[in-house]
């Protein structure tokens, strides 16, 4: 038995990954990558079998953000030529939900730029979500920025299932990425979502000049936060942002990162998110031996892979898509 299978068995028995073991995952020799992914899949299969959860993003409000996040094309300091618009209307949100349903995508993610939502924007999301739930029954994830307790309660009461607010990087590295809000602001929003009964979703962006220890720290911080769903983004450096031209990643390292997140957060939904196409490239399929969830279609301001290609990839791997009906049954069992 190789060392990664031994570690996987210890994790399944309840052991926690030490920093030394975590570093050994990130330093795994490239020629041993299949052994590492075998260990990660041993854990993934225990909790999720061969099922893959599909998610789709609706960019409900673009640009116009006062924050100074260095990776983001929508920030106040970005010079990237993106389309900016205020919150889309209800019909547009419903059209996106229909498209997700028709493509057998179980989770519909409503994302809005900005520091946090106005009460009017929450009203708009609430109004649309109620009809989406009645018509399509999709799992709804909202990502609207820093959240107030009363806003979280309104979203939960309307039928929103999950709230996403990423920690993005380690506490130590946070001020290198943004200074317009604190790391604790982000943690607080996830806690507010949890306290309201929303399923907490929080993840990371890898490739922002962080150290390997930073990667380990963010994976362990998300474990401590008890995020149900963990999106792992890989930086897609956009021209016009402070991180323009940064390209520190390669496909094999990205696989090691995904394996690390699975070993540290064994039972959680690990989602391969933004930047997978440009960073994992031809090794995208291998990522699903650690992760059990992906975004399908376009991201916020960057293009994704064609939906048909994603379905083909999953079929070729022998994995099974969690259908909309299975997702509905799962939600009913939890309620």
Curated annotation (Swiss-Prot):
CDD domains the record matches: Radical_SAM
UniProt: [4Fe-4S] cluster binding residues: 65, 69, 72
Position of the signal peptide: none
Record-listed E.C. numbers: 2.8.1.6
Molecular-function GO terms, alphabetical: 2 iron, 2 sulfur cluster binding; 4 iron, 4 sulfur cluster binding; biotin synthase activity; iron ion binding
Coiled-coil intervals, chain numbering: none
Keyword 4Fe-4S: yes
Cofactor info, note text: Binds 1 [4Fe-4S] cluster. The cluster is coordinated with 3 cysteines and an exchangeable S-adenosyl-L-methionine. Binds 1 [2Fe-2S] cluster. The cluster is coordinated with 3 cysteines and 1 arginine.
First-tier enzyme category under EC: transferase
Alphabetical list of InterPro entries matching this protein: Aldolase_TIM (IPR013785), BATS_dom (IPR010722), Biotin_synth/BioAB (IPR002684), Biotin_synthase (IPR024177), Elp3/MiaA/NifB-like_rSAM (IPR006638), rSAM (IPR007197)
Catalysed reaction, written as an equation: (4R,5S)-dethiobiotin + (sulfur carrier)-SH + 2 reduced [2Fe-2S]-[ferredoxin] + 2 S-adenosyl-L-methionine = (sulfur carrier)-H + biotin + 2 5'-deoxyadenosine + 2 L-methionine + 2 oxidized [2Fe-2S]-[ferredoxin]
Keywords: 2Fe-2S, 4Fe-4S, Biotin biosynthesis, Iron, Iron-sulfur, Metal-binding, S-adenosyl-L-methionine, Transferase
Domain of life per record: Bacteria
Cofactors: [4Fe-4S] cluster; [2Fe-2S] cluster
Matches recorded under SMART domains: BATS (SM00876), Elp3 (SM00729)
Residues binding [2Fe-2S] cluster, per UniProt: 109, 141, 201, 271
Domain Radical SAM core: start-end pairs: 47-276
Pathway(s) it belongs to: Cofactor biosynthesis; biotin biosynthesis; biotin from 7,8-diaminononanoate: step 2/2
This protein's record includes keyword Aminoacyl-tRNA synthetase: no
HAMAP family for this protein: BioB
Name by which UniProt lists this protein: Biotin synthase
Organism: Bacillus subtilis (strain 168)
Lineage per the UniProt record: Bacteria, Bacillati, Bacillota, Bacilli, Bacillales
Recorded name of the encoding gene: bioB
């Amino acid at each position: 038995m190789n060392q990664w299978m031994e570690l996987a068995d210890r994790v399944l028995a309840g052991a926690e990954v030490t920093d030394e073991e975590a570093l050994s995952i990130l330093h795994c020799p490239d020629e041993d990558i299949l052994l590492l992914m075998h260990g990660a899949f041993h854990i993934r299969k225990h909790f999720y079998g061969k099922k893959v959860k599909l998610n789709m993003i609706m960019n409900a409000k673009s640009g116009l953000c006062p924050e100074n996040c260095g990776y983001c094309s929508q920030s106040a300091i970005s010079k990237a030529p993106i389309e900016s618009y205020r919150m889309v209307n209800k019909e547009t949100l419903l059209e996106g939900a229909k498209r997700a349903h028709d493509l057998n995508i179980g989770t519909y993610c409503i994302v809005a730029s900005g520091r946090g939502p106005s009460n009017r924007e929450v009203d708009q999301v609430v109004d649309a979500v109620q009809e989406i739930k009645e018509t399509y029954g999709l799992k709804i994830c909202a990502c609207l920025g820093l959240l107030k307790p009363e806003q979280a309660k309104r979203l939960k009461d309307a039928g929103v299932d999950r709230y996403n607010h990423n920690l993005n990087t380690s506490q130590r590295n946070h001020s290198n990425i943004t200074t317009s809000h604190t790391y604790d602001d982000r943690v607080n929003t996830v806690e507010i979502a949890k306290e309201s009964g929303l399923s907490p979703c929080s993840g990371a962006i890898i490739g922002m000049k962080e150290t390997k220890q930073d990667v380990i720290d963010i994976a362990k911080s998300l474990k401590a936060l008890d995020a149900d769903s963990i999106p792992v983004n890989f930086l897609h450096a956009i021209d016009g942002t402070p991180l323009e031209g940064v390209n520190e990643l390669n496909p094999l390292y990205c696989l090691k990162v995904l394996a690390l997140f699975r070993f540290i957060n064994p039972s959680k939904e690990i989602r391969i998110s933004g930047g997978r196409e440009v960073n994992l490239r031809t090794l995208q399929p291998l990522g699903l031996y650690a992760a059990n969830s992906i975004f399908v279609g376009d991201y916020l301001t960057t293009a994704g892979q064609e939906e048909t290609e994603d379905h083909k990839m999953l079929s070729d791997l022998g994995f099974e898509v969690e259908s909309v009906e299975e997702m509905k049954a799962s939600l009913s069992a939890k309620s």
